[in-house]
From Swiss-Prot:
It comes from Azobacteroides pseudotrichonymphae genomovar. CFP2. The keyword Transmembrane helix does not apply. The keyword Cytoplasm applies. This is 1-(5-phosphoribosyl)-5-[(5-phosphoribosylamino)methylideneamino] imidazole-4-carboxamide isomerase. Its EC number is 5.3.1.16. GO terms for molecular function: 1-(5-phosphoribosyl)-5-[(5-phosphoribosylamino)methylideneamino]imidazole-4-carboxamide isomerase activity. Pathway: Amino-acid biosynthesis; L-histidine biosynthesis; L-histidine from 5-phospho-alpha-D-ribose 1-diphosphate: step 4/9. NCBIfam families: 1-(5-phosphoribosyl)-5-[(5-phosphoribosylamino)methylideneamino]imidazole-4-carboxamide isomerase.
Length: 240
């Protein structure tokens, strides 16, 4: 059964969503992210993808106090991302209650540090964030496109011990127009044992079912929940 992971993105301490990663297209959904997290937990959700969008832009962790509050007031298993660029950032994230962290930009900009994280904390705690636009990896809050192509990028980090990958097609993110199922199928075809988590574009239960059929291990859902395209009670069938 596909694992359901709900997302909370943070800007200035508030729960927001962007469209295609554009900071100018920001919509605030709740002044208190903890309130959102508690509601998720009330409906049986166990996994939370918490994104520090301020941190992603600033290149260092910013909203760790929000992480701390959610971790101390819920039992959600939190994976944290955004602005993790140094050992001290990682230490703050884990000390604040994250069970896992996702590294994307760091894997491109400073692979040596990211390799050390994998070796030190293990592949169960360190996830690879493979965020792409037109099959090219994008970094720094998706504001910068690189020349790294998605498939070789994932393949390289699999060799270094990564087992779990969150793959976001930026063009789909926040659009509520369906996911990049074909891209995910291609990744799975190349590497059948990868724990692949889809992110971006989920708009309805059908999208989740299609991802499950394609062999995805997990799916991150954001705007579809906030815009009530998917009701939290509908997710119970996946035994979150």
């Amino acid at each position: 059964m596909i694992e359901i992971i709900l997302a909370i993105d943070i800007i200035e301490g508030k729960a927001v969503r962007l469209t295609q990663g554009d900071y100018k297209q920001k919509k605030i959904y709740n002044q208190d992210p903890l309130e959102v997290a508690k509601k998720f937990e009330d409906y049986g959700i166990r996994r939370l993808h918490l994104v520090d969008l301020d941190g992603a832009k600033a290149n260092f962790i910013v909203n760790y106090k929000i992480l701390e509050r959610i971790a101390s007031h819920t039992s959600l298993i939190i994976d944290f991302s955004g602005g993790l660029k140094s050992d001290s950032d990682l230490k703050i994230a884990f000390n604040s209650g994250a069970k896992m962290v996702t590294g994307g930009s760091i894997a491109v900009k400073n692979p040596k540090i990211f390799k050390n994280w994998i070796n030190k904390f293990g592949a169960n705690c360190i996830l690879l964030g493979a965020d792409c636009r037109n099959n090219k990896i994008a970094v720094n809050g998706w504001t910068e496109e690189t020349n790294e192509e998605i498939l070789p990028f994932i393949k390289k980090w699999r060799k270094y011990g990564i087992t779990k990958v969150i793959c976001t097609d930026i063009s789909k993110d926040g659009m509520l127009k369906g996911t990049s199922t074909e891209l995910y199928k291609t990744i799975k075809k190349e590497d059948t044992s990868i724990y692949l988590i889809a992110s971006g574009g989920v708009s309805c239960i059908y999208d989740i079912d299609m991802l499950q059929e394609a062999g995805l291990s997990g799916v991150i859902i954001g705007k579809a929940i906030y815009e009530s395209k998917i009701q939290l009670k509908e997710l119970k069938k996946y035994a979150c």
